[in-house]
């Protein structure tokens, strides 16, 4: 058991070593850390009530300057302040939604792959039904039924991603369920639930970690898209998609109102994709070839 533990530790140490050698992945990680720090300390940088949501029509649509680094929007609110508070919303929704998807999808996929037979067929047919519907349409349908709010937004996005993680975990489980350490656990009388939770799921984490990173990027993009059409975070709360939607009518003569929220979305998605690609290469170097 001790040898197995040490082997796993050395494997993860090798993964981190390879990740550090990937410059693009490290760039993505650094950008992501900066975004997270800005989101965490947003209240210290810009007061929410007096700067982020309070209107100041005397300074509406001001271009970038020393006073307002990224300019102001149609209500005179500082765009930089709203962007960093919006980062908190986007990252929170993206990370929590994908975390829920990983847990639910992982359990369903592990049960399906481990037991097989009728259980596998039943779970996979339900998964196929959900996969037949585009994830953004499924999210729109759920939010439309439940109403726009942050909680409902997270629920809708997490439900739309559960089938993806269920299939990924199932595929991993099918490749390891007949290996010697699983048979050894069965031989000593370990219960099915213990085998799934202690042996199956931990050994299926590599593809889940990669897909989870890319999934957060997709969830942030879905959040922005739903907010853009009025089904996500509601004004005056800052959210990148709603900022894009509110500023599109001023694009011709106040380009900064929509440009900077768009750039924030692009940078965040790019950093997550770079990190996800780096994790994929580190966890399975064969995929690089």
Describe these PLM feature segments:
Residues 98-99, 158-161, 172, 211-216, ...:
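Residue-level hotspots within the lipid-embedded alpha helices of multi-pass solute transporters
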Residues 142-145, 157, 172-173, 222-264:
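Glycine-rich helix-loop "coupling/hinge" segments at transmembrane-helix boundaries
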Residues 26-30, 122, 193, 197, ...:
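Signature of the 12-TM Major Facilitator Superfamily
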Residues 69, 73, 79, 100-105, ...:
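Generic hydrophobic transmembrane alpha-helix motif, especially the helices
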Residues 1-106, 110-111, 117-118, 132, ...:
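Gly/Trp-centered helix-boundary motif
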Residues 88-104, 193-225, 272:
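Transmembrane alpha-helices
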Residues 35, 110, 139-144, 153, ...:
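Transmembrane alpha-helix boundary and packing residues in multipass membrane permease domains
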